[in-house]
């Protein structure tokens, strides 16, 4: 799968693949990356996906967009990411193995759900951003190891984004995170989440000012 910049001139490498854009972030021309083509999903595939676990479904979808990571490795990354141990903060009566359990508010006479809430905040930081960030951390570690490279990530946060990023990257080989946060402007819970981390590759920097400064 090749990717294109929204501004039309991605630069080098021409038409990069997933691993290139994973480490590069924005395209050299300042645009965002989009797939060169969008995969088609058949009705049979959709029906088959209904019976998959969250990790299996993530692999099935991601494998259509990530073709430069061997399927066996990508499947292992998904299985490592989406586990009951990582997404363990479920409501009473919930099953952490579901990763994103549905809390049904209404059911019909046959007991089938009609109106439900999808829980996305069962990860390490209780933020929905854990859903993507945990996968991103494992992908970063995998690709950097394959290439023999390291990366420094400079981020700025006003709360949950920074926490989710740090908890996803903590302990990851080849990754160092430098996170700017507004001194005294975050909740006590958010400060405790971020500033209590003792990992050697996580650096919290509290600065005077706000996120938009």
Protein language model regions, located:
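PLP-dependent amino-acid enzyme catalytic core
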Residues: 1-213
């Amino acid at each position: 799968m090749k990717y294109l910049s929204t501004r039309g001139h991605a630069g080098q490498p021409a038409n990069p693949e997933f691993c290139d854009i994973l480490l590069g972030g924005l395209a050299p021309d300042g645009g965002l990356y989009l797939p060169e083509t969008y995969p088609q999903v058949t009705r049979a595939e959709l029906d088959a996906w209904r019976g998959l676990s969250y990790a299996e479904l993530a692999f099935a979808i991601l494998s259509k967009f990530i073709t430069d990571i061997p399927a066996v490795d990508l499947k292992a990354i998904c299985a490592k990411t989406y586990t009951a141990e990582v997404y363990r903060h479920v409501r009473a009566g919930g099953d952490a193995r579901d990763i994103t359990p549905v809390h049904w508010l209404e059911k019909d006479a046959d007991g089938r759900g009609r109106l439900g809430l999808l829980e996305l905040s069962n990860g390490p930081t209780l933020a929905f951003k854990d859903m993507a960030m945990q996968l991103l951390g494992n992908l970063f570690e995998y690709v950097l190891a394959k290439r023999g490279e390291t990366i420094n990530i400079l981020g700025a946060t006003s709360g949950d984004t920074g926490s989710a990023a740090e908890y996803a990257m903590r302990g990851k080989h080849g990754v160092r995170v430098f996170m700017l946060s507004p001194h005294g402007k975050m909740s006590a819970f958010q400060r405790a989440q971020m500033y209590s981390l003792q990992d050697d590759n996580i650096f919290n920097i509290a600065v005077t000012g706000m996120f938009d400064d």
